[in-house]
Amino acid sequence: MPPIILVFFLVLIPASQQYPFSLESLNDQIINEEVIEYMLENSIRSSRTRRVPDEKKIYRCGRRIHSYVFAVCGKACESNTEVNIASKCCREECTDDFIRKQCCP
């Protein structure tokens, strides 16, 4: 019998049977951690402004405001004022006139 197989039978098999390792308890622990993480995610409130529009008002955030400015002005915003239209339009409804006054030359 080759020596490597002999080592396998004499050392590794008895050692693996003495090692107190249970896959079932490990799986239970992983599932418990996932449940706790899921419950914590649901209990934490978002600190961002709400991005879901009301029935009548349309809020534009991120890429939507960029596309909206292109649609109204035909090019990127060239604002000379201190008004941050991205924050304003994400919090409240912005009209075409507001965008024209702030961005279009």
Swiss-Prot record:
Prosequence residues removed at maturation: 19-57
A GO biological process held by the record: olfactory learning
Statement: the UniProt record of this protein carries the keyword Nucleotidyltransferase: no
Annotated signal sequence range: 1-18
Keyword Secreted listed: yes
GO cellular component: extracellular region
UniProt KW keywords: Cleavage on pair of basic residues, Disulfide bond, Secreted, Signal
Disulfide bond positions: 61-90, 73-103, 77-104, 89-94
Protein location: Secreted
UniProt main location, coarse: secreted
GO molecular function: hormone activity
Pfam families the UniProt entry points to: Ins_beta (PF03488)
Phenotype of the disrupted gene, per the record: RNAi-mediated knockdown extends lifespan.
Protein role: Insulin-like peptide which plays a role in ageing as a consequence of daf-16 activity.
UniProt similarity note: Belongs to the insulin family.
Protein name: Insulin-like peptide 7
The species this protein was found in: Caenorhabditis elegans
